[in-house]
């Protein structure tokens, strides 16, 4: 018998099949109401009609994902493009950030989700407090079935088949991994404030970078218990306005992060991450050559008369 990489350590690009394999790290969708909008397109931005919006609402989507250091420049292009348009950011609008995860293994992807979950409530309070509990932006605490599904998919090794439409309208959209090779973060309120969006992207990428280095998701649960929520937050959140907003929530910070860690526990301890079972491959050739002697002997014993050509 031969073995191959355990299921949990397989790269996502071997579990999912995407039409596009972009090199960029970040995709952004900005929903705006108001207008009128320019007749021509901004460089690397495509306008889409969004029927969930009102008053001439439109969604601008980055055409090609950009590297982290180009996020600010891309947003400035859109800002300049819309400078003469009336921009209205109502409760219906939001900013969605897609983080490319095609470079991750399944283990790293689970690490990323777990680490985000610990901070999720506090982060949503900073970037989109009015979206907390929104049915199109459900947090893990609002839909804890997502964690149970994730756990079962890891144990049964069926996770790619479980990422269905039920997960789309979440603060952290897991379904986007199956469809686009990203994790989509939907919590940010509608805005086109470049420093604010840049800080949000920086935060999401810092969590991804940490997830790539972690041994498994249980590390985060154990480390938070050892360091305490405040020091844990200081360690993993980059020093920016998003982190400042999280750390300012002293009255709820500990309870919120411990609740996030409790949600993560079922996933963090669902398998033995140190010794995941390998996938066994039989030595036999998948399609062995026919035994022609046996075939001819079998045919010789049959009455083939009357069989049409």
Predicted features along the sequence, with ranges:
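Terminal catalytic/cofactor-binding subdomain
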Residues: 1-86
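Helical (often loop-to-helix) elements that flank the catalytic cores of nucleotide-handling enzymes
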Residues: 70-78, 102-127, 193-208, 246-252
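A cross-taxon signal for low-complexity, glycine/charged-rich
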Residues: 286-287, 294-306
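Histidine-centered divalent-metal-coordination microenvironment in nucleic-acid enzymes
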Residues: 88-104, 182-186
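Aromatic/basic-lined ligand-recognition segments
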Residues: 25-27, 110-191
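Beta-strand-rich recognition/accessory modules
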Residues: 168, 179-216
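Flexible helix-coil linker/hinge segments at domain or subdomain boundaries
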Residues: 88, 121-135, 209-241
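Acidic, carboxylate-rich catalytic segments that either coordinate divalent cations
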Residues: 236-273
